[in-house]
Amino acid sequence: MERKDFETWLDNISVTFLSLTDLQKNETLDHLISLSGAVQLRHLSNNLETLLKRDFLKLLPLELSFYLLKWLDPQTLLTCCLVSKQWNKVISACTEVWQTACKSLGWQIDDSVQDALHWKKVYLKAILRMKQLEDHEAFETSSLIGHSARVYALYYKDGLLCTGSDDLSAKLWDVSTGQCVYGIQTHTCAAVKFDEQKLVTGSFDNTVACWEWSSGARTQHFRGHTGAVFSVDYNDELDILVSGSADFTVKVWALSAGTCLNTLTGHTEWVTKVVLQKCKVKSLLHSPGDYILLSADKYEIKIWPIGREINCKCLKTLSVSEDRSICLQPRLHFDGKYIVCSSALGLYQWDFASYDILRVIKTPEIANLALLGFGDIFALLFDNRYLYILDLRTESLISRWPLPEYRKSKRGSSFLAGEASWLNGLDGHNDTGLVFATSMPDHSIHLVLWKEHG
Protein backbone atom coordinates (compact mmCIF):
# COMPACT_ATOMS: atom_id res chain seq x y z
CA MET A 1 0.00 0.00 0.00
CA GLU A 2 1.29 3.39 -0.97
CA ARG A 3 2.04 5.88 1.83
CA LYS A 4 -0.76 8.26 0.79
CA ASP A 5 -3.32 5.45 0.57
CA PHE A 6 -2.10 4.12 3.95
CA GLU A 7 -2.54 7.48 5.63
CA THR A 8 -6.09 7.79 4.20
CA TRP A 9 -6.91 4.29 5.41
CA LEU A 10 -5.44 5.00 8.85
CA ASP A 11 -7.48 8.20 9.21
CA ASN A 12 -10.70 6.35 8.36
CA ILE A 13 -9.90 3.52 10.73
CA SER A 14 -9.09 6.03 13.51
CA VAL A 15 -12.44 7.79 13.07
CA THR A 16 -14.26 4.47 13.18
CA PHE A 17 -12.21 3.28 16.20
CA LEU A 18 -13.06 6.42 18.17
CA SER A 19 -16.76 5.80 17.60
CA LEU A 20 -16.64 2.34 19.16
CA THR A 21 -17.55 1.52 22.74
CA ASP A 22 -14.81 0.62 25.20
CA LEU A 23 -15.69 -3.06 24.90
CA GLN A 24 -15.51 -2.89 21.10
CA LYS A 25 -12.18 -1.05 21.28
CA ASN A 26 -10.79 -3.80 23.52
CA GLU A 27 -11.99 -6.54 21.14
CA THR A 28 -10.42 -4.68 18.22
CA LEU A 29 -7.07 -4.44 20.04
CA ASP A 30 -7.21 -8.12 21.01
CA HIS A 31 -7.83 -9.05 17.37
CA LEU A 32 -4.97 -6.85 16.13
CA ILE A 33 -2.61 -8.33 18.74
CA SER A 34 -3.53 -11.85 17.64
CA LEU A 35 -2.61 -10.92 14.06
CA SER A 36 0.74 -9.35 15.09
CA GLY A 37 4.13 -10.93 14.64
CA ALA A 38 7.29 -10.71 16.75
CA VAL A 39 8.33 -7.29 15.42
CA GLN A 40 4.93 -5.77 16.21
CA LEU A 41 4.77 -7.33 19.69
CA ARG A 42 8.27 -6.04 20.54
CA HIS A 43 7.27 -2.56 19.37
CA LEU A 44 4.10 -2.77 21.46
CA SER A 45 6.02 -3.87 24.56
CA ASN A 46 8.53 -1.00 24.32
CA ASN A 47 5.89 1.67 23.86
CA LEU A 48 3.47 0.36 26.48
CA GLU A 49 6.12 0.66 29.23
CA THR A 50 6.62 4.32 28.37
CA LEU A 51 2.87 4.98 28.31
CA LEU A 52 1.86 3.02 31.40
CA LYS A 53 4.94 3.57 33.61
CA ARG A 54 5.65 7.24 33.17
CA ASP A 55 8.88 8.44 34.79
CA PHE A 56 7.50 11.58 36.42
CA LEU A 57 10.90 12.48 37.88
CA LYS A 58 12.29 12.52 34.35
CA LEU A 59 9.33 14.31 32.78
CA LEU A 60 8.67 16.96 35.43
CA PRO A 61 10.54 20.28 35.49
CA LEU A 62 13.53 20.09 37.85
CA GLU A 63 11.97 22.59 40.30
CA LEU A 64 8.88 20.39 40.73
CA SER A 65 11.01 17.26 41.11
CA PHE A 66 13.00 18.95 43.89
CA TYR A 67 9.77 20.01 45.60
CA LEU A 68 8.47 16.42 45.62
CA LEU A 69 11.79 15.06 46.86
CA LYS A 70 11.63 17.31 49.93
CA TRP A 71 8.75 15.18 51.24
CA LEU A 72 10.81 11.99 51.33
CA ASP A 73 12.85 10.82 54.31
CA PRO A 74 16.62 10.39 53.78
CA GLN A 75 16.56 6.59 53.70
CA THR A 76 13.87 6.62 50.99
CA LEU A 77 15.95 9.13 49.02
CA LEU A 78 18.90 6.74 49.06
CA THR A 79 16.63 3.91 47.88
CA CYS A 80 15.28 6.09 45.07
CA CYS A 81 18.85 6.75 43.92
CA LEU A 82 19.01 3.06 42.97
CA VAL A 83 15.99 3.19 40.62
CA SER A 84 17.87 4.50 37.58
CA LYS A 85 20.79 6.66 36.52
CA GLN A 86 18.35 9.49 35.78
CA TRP A 87 16.78 9.30 39.25
CA ASN A 88 20.20 9.20 40.90
CA LYS A 89 21.26 12.25 38.87
CA VAL A 90 18.16 14.27 39.82
CA ILE A 91 18.15 13.29 43.51
CA SER A 92 21.90 13.81 43.89
CA ALA A 93 21.51 17.33 42.46
CA CYS A 94 18.98 18.52 45.06
CA THR A 95 21.01 20.51 47.61
CA GLU A 96 18.12 21.25 49.97
CA VAL A 97 17.09 17.64 50.57
CA TRP A 98 20.64 16.59 51.52
CA GLN A 99 21.17 19.61 53.73
CA THR A 100 17.89 18.79 55.50
CA ALA A 101 18.95 15.16 55.81
CA CYS A 102 22.21 16.24 57.46
CA LYS A 103 20.35 18.54 59.85
CA SER A 104 18.06 15.67 60.87
CA LEU A 105 21.15 13.89 62.22
CA GLY A 106 22.28 16.93 64.18
CA TRP A 107 24.89 17.98 61.63
CA GLN A 108 26.02 21.60 61.33
CA ILE A 109 25.26 23.05 57.89
CA ASP A 110 27.00 25.87 56.03
CA ASP A 111 24.17 27.18 53.84
CA SER A 112 26.64 29.04 51.63
CA VAL A 113 27.87 25.70 50.24
CA GLN A 114 25.33 24.79 47.54
CA ASP A 115 27.06 21.70 46.15
CA ALA A 116 24.41 18.97 46.42
CA LEU A 117 26.87 16.13 45.87
CA HIS A 118 29.00 17.47 48.72
CA TRP A 119 26.04 17.34 51.11
CA LYS A 120 25.07 13.87 49.95
CA LYS A 121 28.60 12.69 50.79
CA VAL A 122 28.41 14.49 54.15
CA TYR A 123 25.11 12.73 54.88
CA LEU A 124 26.57 9.31 54.06
CA LYS A 125 29.51 10.10 56.35
CA ALA A 126 27.07 11.29 59.02
CA ILE A 127 24.94 8.15 59.06
CA LEU A 128 28.10 6.09 59.36
CA ARG A 129 29.17 8.08 62.45
CA MET A 130 25.66 7.86 63.96
CA LYS A 131 25.66 4.11 63.35
CA GLN A 132 29.01 3.89 65.14
CA LEU A 133 27.52 5.79 68.09
CA GLU A 134 24.55 3.43 68.24
CA ASP A 135 26.79 0.36 68.00
CA HIS A 136 29.27 1.62 70.65
CA GLU A 137 32.07 1.83 68.07
CA ALA A 138 32.63 5.61 67.83
CA PHE A 139 35.18 5.92 70.64
CA GLU A 140 38.46 4.46 71.78
CA THR A 141 40.32 4.69 75.08
CA SER A 142 43.80 5.60 76.26
CA SER A 143 45.61 6.30 79.54
CA LEU A 144 48.02 8.91 80.87
CA ILE A 145 50.48 7.62 83.46
CA GLY A 146 52.81 9.77 85.53
CA HIS A 147 51.32 10.73 88.90
CA SER A 148 52.14 8.87 92.12
CA ALA A 149 49.11 9.95 94.20
CA ARG A 150 45.41 10.61 93.62
CA VAL A 151 44.48 13.09 90.91
CA TYR A 152 41.59 15.31 91.95
CA ALA A 153 41.90 18.23 89.53
CA LEU A 154 41.48 18.23 85.74
CA TYR A 155 41.18 21.00 83.16
CA TYR A 156 41.08 20.68 79.36
CA LYS A 157 41.72 23.27 76.66
CA ASP A 158 42.72 23.11 72.98
CA GLY A 159 44.07 19.57 72.97
CA LEU A 160 45.92 19.94 76.28
CA LEU A 161 44.89 18.34 79.58
CA CYS A 162 46.15 19.59 82.94
CA THR A 163 46.17 17.23 85.91
CA GLY A 164 46.75 18.26 89.52
CA SER A 165 47.64 15.66 92.10
CA ASP A 166 48.21 15.01 95.78
CA ASP A 167 51.80 14.14 94.83
CA LEU A 168 52.37 17.94 94.90
CA SER A 169 52.67 18.25 91.14
CA ALA A 170 50.71 19.43 88.13
CA LYS A 171 51.27 18.06 84.66
CA LEU A 172 50.25 19.32 81.23
CA TRP A 173 49.59 16.59 78.67
CA ASP A 174 49.24 16.62 74.89
CA VAL A 175 46.15 14.42 74.50
CA SER A 176 46.89 13.47 70.88
CA THR A 177 50.34 12.05 71.68
CA GLY A 178 49.94 11.18 75.36
CA GLN A 179 53.18 13.04 76.10
CA CYS A 180 53.74 15.24 79.16
CA VAL A 181 54.53 18.78 77.96
CA TYR A 182 55.21 20.35 81.37
CA GLY A 183 55.52 19.02 84.89
CA ILE A 184 55.93 21.39 87.83
CA GLN A 185 56.01 21.08 91.61
CA THR A 186 52.96 22.62 93.31
CA HIS A 187 50.88 22.26 96.46
CA THR A 188 48.04 19.73 96.65
CA CYS A 189 45.61 20.49 93.84
CA ALA A 190 41.83 20.50 94.24
CA ALA A 191 41.21 22.66 91.15
CA VAL A 192 43.27 23.80 88.15
CA LYS A 193 42.95 26.15 85.20
CA PHE A 194 45.67 27.13 82.72
CA ASP A 195 46.63 29.05 79.61
CA GLU A 196 49.82 29.08 77.52
CA GLN A 197 51.89 30.95 80.11
CA LYS A 198 50.45 30.13 83.51
CA LEU A 199 48.67 27.67 85.73
CA VAL A 200 46.25 28.61 88.53
CA THR A 201 45.65 26.05 91.27
CA GLY A 202 43.19 25.82 94.14
CA SER A 203 44.46 23.70 96.99
CA PHE A 204 43.44 21.64 99.98
CA ASP A 205 45.87 23.91 101.92
CA ASN A 206 43.20 26.69 101.70
CA THR A 207 45.18 28.82 99.22
CA VAL A 208 45.24 29.64 95.53
CA ALA A 209 48.50 29.92 93.60
CA CYS A 210 49.63 31.05 90.17
CA TRP A 211 52.56 29.28 88.49
CA GLU A 212 54.66 29.89 85.41
CA TRP A 213 54.81 26.87 83.10
CA SER A 214 58.20 27.60 81.59
CA SER A 215 60.10 27.97 84.87
CA GLY A 216 57.79 26.22 87.33
CA ALA A 217 58.03 29.27 89.61
CA ARG A 218 55.13 30.38 91.77
CA THR A 219 54.35 33.94 90.67
CA GLN A 220 51.47 34.68 93.04
CA HIS A 221 49.97 33.25 96.23
CA PHE A 222 46.40 34.07 97.29
CA ARG A 223 45.73 33.59 101.01
CA GLY A 224 42.48 34.20 102.84
CA HIS A 225 40.21 31.16 102.64
CA THR A 226 39.76 29.07 105.78
CA GLY A 227 38.79 25.90 103.92
CA ALA A 228 39.98 23.95 100.88
CA VAL A 229 39.62 25.79 97.56
CA PHE A 230 37.48 23.63 95.29
CA SER A 231 37.11 25.82 92.21
CA VAL A 232 38.97 28.63 90.46
CA ASP A 233 38.39 30.79 87.41
CA TYR A 234 40.12 33.89 86.09
CA ASN A 235 40.02 36.50 83.35
CA ASP A 236 43.12 38.35 82.17
CA GLU A 237 41.09 41.16 80.61
CA LEU A 238 39.46 41.94 83.96
CA ASP A 239 42.63 41.08 85.91
CA ILE A 240 40.36 39.09 88.22
CA LEU A 241 40.57 35.66 89.79
CA VAL A 242 37.64 34.05 91.63
CA SER A 243 37.72 31.10 94.00
CA GLY A 244 35.10 28.93 95.71
CA SER A 245 35.86 27.20 98.98
CA ALA A 246 34.79 24.72 101.63
CA ASP A 247 34.50 27.76 103.94
CA PHE A 248 31.20 28.56 102.10
CA THR A 249 32.60 31.76 100.54
CA VAL A 250 33.53 33.05 97.11
CA LYS A 251 36.54 35.37 96.96
CA VAL A 252 37.38 37.84 94.21
CA TRP A 253 41.10 38.59 93.81
CA ALA A 254 43.28 40.93 91.79
CA LEU A 255 45.00 38.41 89.52
CA SER A 256 48.24 40.33 89.04
CA ALA A 257 48.54 41.83 92.55
CA GLY A 258 47.29 38.88 94.58
CA THR A 259 45.11 41.04 96.84
CA CYS A 260 41.59 40.09 97.89
CA LEU A 261 39.05 42.51 96.40
CA ASN A 262 35.89 41.01 97.84
CA THR A 263 34.47 38.11 99.83
CA LEU A 264 30.99 36.96 98.81
CA THR A 265 28.91 35.22 101.46
CA GLY A 266 25.55 33.52 101.35
CA HIS A 267 26.32 29.91 100.59
CA THR A 268 25.63 27.43 103.38
CA GLU A 269 27.50 24.52 101.77
CA TRP A 270 30.85 23.98 100.10
CA VAL A 271 31.20 26.17 97.02
CA THR A 272 32.14 23.58 94.41
CA LYS A 273 32.02 25.70 91.25
CA VAL A 274 32.74 29.30 90.25
CA VAL A 275 32.38 30.58 86.68
CA LEU A 276 33.40 33.88 85.05
CA GLN A 277 31.60 34.27 81.73
CA LYS A 278 30.38 36.99 79.37
CA CYS A 279 26.62 37.48 79.15
CA LYS A 280 25.26 36.95 75.61
CA VAL A 281 21.66 38.09 76.17
CA LYS A 282 19.91 41.07 77.68
CA SER A 283 18.70 39.92 81.06
CA LEU A 284 16.86 41.56 83.91
CA LEU A 285 20.17 42.53 85.50
CA HIS A 286 22.76 42.36 82.69
CA SER A 287 23.45 43.42 79.13
CA PRO A 288 25.27 41.50 76.38
CA GLY A 289 29.02 41.74 76.93
CA ASP A 290 28.79 42.11 80.71
CA TYR A 291 30.88 39.66 82.71
CA ILE A 292 28.92 37.34 84.99
CA LEU A 293 30.06 35.54 88.14
CA LEU A 294 28.26 32.33 89.03
CA SER A 295 28.86 30.12 92.05
CA ALA A 296 27.26 26.82 93.00
CA ASP A 297 26.96 24.53 95.98
CA LYS A 298 25.01 21.28 96.32
CA TYR A 299 21.64 23.08 96.55
CA GLU A 300 21.92 26.53 94.95
CA ILE A 301 23.37 28.50 92.06
CA LYS A 302 24.09 32.15 92.84
CA ILE A 303 24.62 35.05 90.43
CA TRP A 304 26.83 37.91 91.64
CA PRO A 305 27.86 41.37 90.48
CA ILE A 306 31.52 41.80 89.61
CA GLY A 307 32.67 44.83 91.55
CA ARG A 308 34.64 46.00 94.55
CA GLU A 309 31.69 46.93 96.70
CA ILE A 310 32.14 45.43 100.15
CA ASN A 311 29.42 43.01 101.30
CA CYS A 312 27.72 43.12 97.89
CA LYS A 313 24.50 41.13 97.66
CA CYS A 314 23.70 38.14 95.49
CA LEU A 315 21.64 39.22 92.47
CA LYS A 316 19.75 35.95 92.02
CA THR A 317 19.62 32.48 93.54
CA LEU A 318 18.46 29.46 91.52
CA SER A 319 17.50 26.08 92.94
CA VAL A 320 15.35 23.09 92.04
CA SER A 321 13.63 22.76 95.41
CA GLU A 322 12.87 25.42 98.01
CA ASP A 323 13.11 22.97 100.91
CA ARG A 324 16.54 21.72 99.76
CA SER A 325 15.23 18.21 99.37
CA ILE A 326 16.83 17.87 95.93
CA CYS A 327 20.59 18.16 95.46
CA LEU A 328 22.32 19.53 92.39
CA GLN A 329 24.85 17.23 90.75
CA PRO A 330 28.40 18.58 90.44
CA ARG A 331 29.28 20.37 87.18
CA LEU A 332 27.62 23.56 86.01
CA HIS A 333 27.15 24.71 82.41
CA PHE A 334 26.86 28.41 81.57
CA ASP A 335 27.43 29.70 78.04
CA GLY A 336 26.14 33.26 78.49
CA LYS A 337 22.60 32.33 77.42
CA TYR A 338 21.61 29.32 79.48
CA ILE A 339 22.46 27.84 82.85
CA VAL A 340 22.24 24.05 82.97
CA CYS A 341 22.69 21.73 85.91
CA SER A 342 21.71 18.15 86.65
CA SER A 343 19.75 16.87 89.64
CA ALA A 344 17.96 13.73 90.76
CA LEU A 345 14.83 15.11 89.05
CA GLY A 346 16.55 15.56 85.69
CA LEU A 347 18.48 18.11 83.71
CA TYR A 348 17.42 21.70 84.49
CA GLN A 349 17.87 24.47 81.92
CA TRP A 350 17.38 28.11 82.96
CA ASP A 351 17.01 31.02 80.56
CA PHE A 352 19.56 33.61 81.67
CA ALA A 353 17.49 36.47 80.22
CA SER A 354 14.56 35.80 82.57
CA TYR A 355 15.98 33.26 85.07
CA ASP A 356 12.96 31.07 84.29
CA ILE A 357 13.27 27.31 83.98
CA LEU A 358 12.96 26.58 80.26
CA ARG A 359 12.69 22.84 80.60
CA VAL A 360 13.46 19.83 82.71
CA ILE A 361 14.83 16.90 80.73
CA LYS A 362 14.15 13.56 82.36
CA THR A 363 15.67 10.22 81.42
CA PRO A 364 13.29 7.78 83.12
CA GLU A 365 15.21 4.72 81.96
CA ILE A 366 18.34 5.95 83.78
CA ALA A 367 18.18 8.11 86.90
CA ASN A 368 20.74 10.45 88.48
CA LEU A 369 22.79 11.23 85.41
CA ALA A 370 25.48 13.86 85.92
CA LEU A 371 26.12 16.61 83.37
CA LEU A 372 29.41 16.87 81.49
CA GLY A 373 28.56 19.08 78.52
CA PHE A 374 25.53 20.79 76.98
CA GLY A 375 25.06 22.17 73.46
CA ASP A 376 22.42 23.11 70.91
CA ILE A 377 21.93 19.52 69.71
CA PHE A 378 23.54 17.09 72.15
CA ALA A 379 24.32 16.77 75.86
CA LEU A 380 27.04 14.57 77.33
CA LEU A 381 26.04 12.78 80.55
CA PHE A 382 27.39 9.97 82.67
CA ASP A 383 26.85 7.78 85.70
CA ASN A 384 29.01 5.26 87.52
CA ARG A 385 29.01 2.81 84.61
CA TYR A 386 28.47 4.60 81.32
CA LEU A 387 29.00 7.75 79.28
CA TYR A 388 25.79 8.84 77.49
CA ILE A 389 24.93 11.10 74.57
CA LEU A 390 21.51 12.72 74.79
CA ASP A 391 19.78 14.15 71.70
CA LEU A 392 18.26 17.35 73.08
CA ARG A 393 15.73 17.61 70.23
CA THR A 394 14.06 14.32 71.11
CA GLU A 395 15.31 14.13 74.72
CA SER A 396 16.36 10.54 74.08
CA LEU A 397 19.65 8.75 74.73
CA ILE A 398 21.28 7.83 71.42
CA SER A 399 24.56 6.32 72.57
CA ARG A 400 26.41 4.99 75.58
CA TRP A 401 30.00 3.97 76.25
CA PRO A 402 31.19 1.76 79.14
CA LEU A 403 33.42 3.32 81.78
CA PRO A 404 35.86 1.56 84.13
CA GLU A 405 35.61 1.89 87.90
CA TYR A 406 36.96 5.41 88.09
CA ARG A 407 37.59 7.77 91.02
CA LYS A 408 34.45 9.94 91.17
CA SER A 409 34.81 13.13 93.18
CA LYS A 410 31.66 14.44 94.85
CA ARG A 411 32.77 17.92 93.79
CA GLY A 412 33.02 16.95 90.14
CA SER A 413 36.69 17.90 89.85
CA SER A 414 38.07 14.50 88.88
CA PHE A 415 36.22 14.14 85.57
CA LEU A 416 35.42 16.40 82.64
CA ALA A 417 34.30 16.62 79.03
CA GLY A 418 36.86 17.28 76.32
CA GLU A 419 36.10 18.99 73.02
CA ALA A 420 32.66 20.60 73.18
CA SER A 421 31.96 22.02 69.70
CA TRP A 422 30.34 18.78 68.50
CA LEU A 423 27.61 19.23 71.13
CA ASN A 424 26.27 22.07 68.94
CA GLY A 425 26.10 19.67 66.00
CA LEU A 426 28.59 17.39 64.30
CA ASP A 427 30.13 18.65 61.06
CA GLY A 428 32.36 15.81 59.96
CA HIS A 429 35.47 17.52 61.33
CA ASN A 430 34.75 18.27 65.00
CA ASP A 431 34.30 14.62 66.03
CA THR A 432 37.97 14.28 66.90
CA GLY A 433 40.07 14.45 70.03
CA LEU A 434 39.08 14.09 73.67
CA VAL A 435 35.51 13.24 74.68
CA PHE A 436 35.92 12.47 78.39
CA ALA A 437 38.68 12.19 80.99
CA THR A 438 38.67 10.94 84.56
CA SER A 439 41.20 10.02 87.23
CA MET A 440 41.56 6.38 88.22
CA PRO A 441 42.26 4.64 91.55
CA ASP A 442 45.77 3.76 90.31
CA HIS A 443 46.46 7.53 89.81
CA SER A 444 46.38 7.26 86.00
CA ILE A 445 44.03 9.26 83.77
CA HIS A 446 41.48 7.37 81.68
CA LEU A 447 40.72 9.04 78.33
CA VAL A 448 37.80 8.45 75.98
CA LEU A 449 38.56 9.76 72.49
CA TRP A 450 36.76 9.94 69.16
CA LYS A 451 37.84 7.12 66.88
CA GLU A 452 38.99 8.25 63.44
CA HIS A 453 36.50 7.83 60.60
CA GLY A 454 36.89 4.42 59.02
From Swiss-Prot:
Per UniProt, what is one Pfam family of this protein?
WD40
Q: What keywords appear on the UniProt entry? A: Acetylation, Repeat, Ubl conjugation pathway, WD repeat
Residue positions, PTM N6-acetyllysine: 298
Ranges for the F-box domain? 54-101
Keyword flag Transmembrane: no
Q: Does the keyword Acetylation apply?
A: yes
Under CDD domains, the record lists: F-box_FBXW2, WD40
Q: Source organism's superkingdom?
A: Eukaryota
Task: Give start and end residues of every WD repeat.
Answer: 146-183, 185-221, 224-265, 276-314
Protein function? Substrate-recognition component of the SCF (SKP1-CUL1-F-box protein)-type E3 ubiquitin ligase complex.
Query: Could you give the subunit structure recorded for this chain?
Result: Directly interacts with SKP1 and CUL1.
PANTHER family in the cross-refs: F-BOX/WD REPEAT-CONTAINING PROTEIN 2, F-BOX_WD REPEAT-CONTAINING PROTEIN 2
Can you say what this protein is called?
Answer: F-box/WD repeat-containing protein 2
Annotated organism of origin: Bos taurus
Q: What is the taxonomic lineage of the source species?
A: Eukaryota, Metazoa, Chordata, Craniata, Vertebrata
